A protein has these predicted regions:
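Short, low-complexity N-terminal intrinsically disordered segments enriched in polar/charged residues
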Residues: 1-45
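Active-site rim elements
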Residues: 26, 55, 142-144
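A solvent-exposed, acidic/Ser-Thr-rich amphipathic alpha-helical stretch
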Residues: 36-134
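Short, surface-exposed coil-to-beta transition loops
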Residues: 110-112, 147-153
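A hydrophobic membrane-anchoring alpha-helix module
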Residues: 183-242
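Conserved catalytic-core segments centered on acid/base and nucleophilic motifs
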Residues: 28-31, 39, 117, 155-158, ...
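Short, cysteine-centered beta-strand-loop-beta hairpins and adjacent loop/turn segments enriched
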Residues: 135-147, 175-177
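Short beta-strand edge/turn micro-motifs at domain boundaries
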Residues: 125-129, 150-184
Length: 242
């Protein structure tokens, strides 16, 4: 039987849906600005069993999730330093401090769409799924490069001390490929010796796993992240984490 809600319950649920979309949107915005120091402390639950997932595995537990954002911030600072060193004679760099130049060599735009949000019947949690398309441009070991990142963001959120916080967050990428090339072919952009210092490694999951397989011409059908569906409590439904 379809769940019936009072006008007040409907209003409360609309506010929760708005909050869920705002929180995950703010996380995406911080990623676009490399403001990684703001993400964990402002938007994640303080519970120990939080989980952050990517195609190649999970960051499981509070320390691992916080460590991911700490490493992303360190990488952004390292990129700034490398850009300042390589182009130290450029007028836009001369006389500037690292703090003033933070974010140099990096720009990202993320478009999130097709939101699906389900609020639990007990109104203590919510599940959400988006598709997204991002253009990630930065100086890399292959030189300055723009990369399409297209896929899904999925999240479990919980109410914690009167505020909504992320418990699990999953990024499932279908496309991770340079913008100027067909997705059906291997990339022709190889390492460039003069940019070798820009080979900055991404954080490695603490629980390696093939969570999701990116598109390739001969990829078998890849089931997308499960769509949120009506549920009673978070304990009684599936999870976007492990």
């Amino acid at each position: 039987m379809k769940q019936q809600f009072t006008p007040q319950e409907m209003a409360d649920r609309c506010l929760i849906i708005r909050e869920v979309q705002n929180i995950v949107g703010k996380v995406a915005h911080c990623d676009m600005l490399a403001d990684y120091d703001l993400v964990y402390k402002n938007f994640w639950s303080t519970q120990e069993d939080v989980c952050l997932g990517f195609n190649n595995g999970y960051f499981k537990g509070a320390a691992a999730v916080k460590g991911y954002y700490d490493q992303k911030l360190a990488n952004a600072k390292k990129l700034t330093e490398l850009v300042m060193e390589k182009w130290k004679d450029h007028k836009d760099v001369q006389g500037k401090t690292a703090a003033e130049m933070f974010g140099a060599g990096y720009v990202k735009g993320t478009d999130m769409h097709t939101p699906i949000v389900e609020v639990a019947q007990d109104m203590k949690s919510a599940k959400a799924l988006w598709q997204f398309q991002a253009a990630d441009t930065r100086v890399t070991a292959r030189g300055p490069l723009s990369v399409w990142k297209i896929g899904y963001m999925a999240a479990d959120l919980i109410e914690e001390d009167g505020q909504w916080k992320i418990k699990n967050l999953l990024y499932a990428l279908d496309i991770d490929h340079p913008c100027a090339e067909p997705w059906t072919e291997p990339s022709k952009y190889g390492p460039i010796p003069e940019f070798a210092a820009f080979d900055i490694p991404e954080p490695e999951p603490t629980v390696p796993a093939e969570v999701y397989k990116a598109y390739a011409p001969r990829r078998p059908y890849q089931e997308p992240p499960r769509m949120p569906e009506p549920y009673t409590t978070l304990a009684e439904t599936f999870s976007y984490g492990i």
